[in-house]
Each structure stands twice: as structure tokens, then as C-alpha cells.
Amino acid sequence: MANERIVYFAHGQESGPWGTKIKRLAQVAENLNFRVVSPDYSGFKSGYGRVEKLLSLQPSAAEQIILVGSSMGSWVSLCASEKLKPQGLFLLASAVGLENLEPNSPRPFAEKTLLVHGWDDEVVPVENAINFARNYQVPLHLLPADHRLITQLDSVANIFQNFLQQCLESKKDADPRSQWEKEQEAKFQKETINQIQPRIPR
């Protein structure tokens, strides 16, 4: 439905669609009246297969899309963002800067992007997240946790809630008019100014 707000979760390579983090963050999203979709990507060995599955769900039909990814799921969300142009990208323990993924640091295509990473991540070095955040000028939250971030789940949930609220405020403040309407108003204002502008005698 065109008026829906939907959060799409993408789980990690070794986890499932309703792991501990996703369950907790899904509650946060539902409390803010987002519908939650968490596909099962466990049958896909290829990251590209996961991206294609996400795109096949036609998320662009929703009014407001937030993509949330964990580990490999962050890479999937980043790759899908180029076509979907979501309002938000919320990336946990992102699989970026890894040699076995191509592209290894996909560009984020979203109005708002935020990374959360553990200082003690044993799978994706924290330097990878820092470099990604620096290269694409996106905010990064570093927490005292490992790759799973479970020990900091309360903090992750609070960060996610603030992120969704910012996305909602951004949507509320957006100008709902079409480009044609904006151009017509600008044209009208220009003509009005020209009409009331006093003529300078020669």
C-alpha cells in the first residue's frame, strides 16, 4: 500500500530472520506504527541472491521504507538501496571493507544512514566501519561489544528508536508538492514581483 511505513530487516549470514536483535528492534518499529518485514535469506549462499529477493518484495510500493541490516544483511541493504532509495539505512556490525564481498563497500543511497558497530568486533574490524563512515560522511555509533552486539542491545534499541523518530520528523517536514507545483509557484511569484516593481523613469 502506498501509504504504508515499512521496516525491512536483513539478517546476517549465520543467523535467521527472527533472531534476538531483530525481535527487539521489531518491537521498537511497531511501537512507532511501522510494519515489519523480515525475510528468510538462509537459503541463499550468494549475497546477490539476497539482494534480488529483497528487491522482489517490491518495497518501493510503500510510502516510507527503512532498511535495517545486520552483518551480511547490512551489505544486502546497502546494495538494495541504490534501486530503492529508502528514507533510512540502519546498519549493524556492517560487513563492509571485506575482500570476499564485491563491491566491498557499497555506497549508501538513503536520506539518512547510520552505522552501529562494536569496538571488539571479531568478524568485521572496527577500522572498516570507521573508514566507511569517514568515506561516506555518515554517523557511526561505536559500542563496547563484539560482532553480535547483544550485550549492548538496550543501547542499540534506543539508537534505533531515535533514528526512526528522526526519519518520521524528516518525512513530516518534507514538502509534499510535486516539482511541477513548485515550479508554478516560483513562476507566479516572479511574475507578481515584476508587476509590483516600480518602473524607473528614463
Sequence positions of predicted segments:
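Short beta-strand/loop motif that positions the catalytic acidic residue
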Residues: 109, 114-117, 121
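A conserved short beta-strand
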Residues: 85-97
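Conserved alpha/beta-hydrolase "acid-adjacent" motif
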Residues: 18, 122-128
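Acidic beta-to-alpha connecting loop that harbors the catalytic carboxylate
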Residues: 13, 119-121, 145-146
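Short, surface-exposed "cap/lid" segments of acyl-processing enzymes
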Residues: 2-44, 196
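Catalytic histidine neighborhood in serine/cysteine hydrolases
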Residues: 134-150
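Gly/Ala-rich beta-loop-alpha elbow adjacent to hydrolase catalytic centers
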Residues: 68-77
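Post-His helix in hydrolase/transferase enzymes
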Residues: 150-166
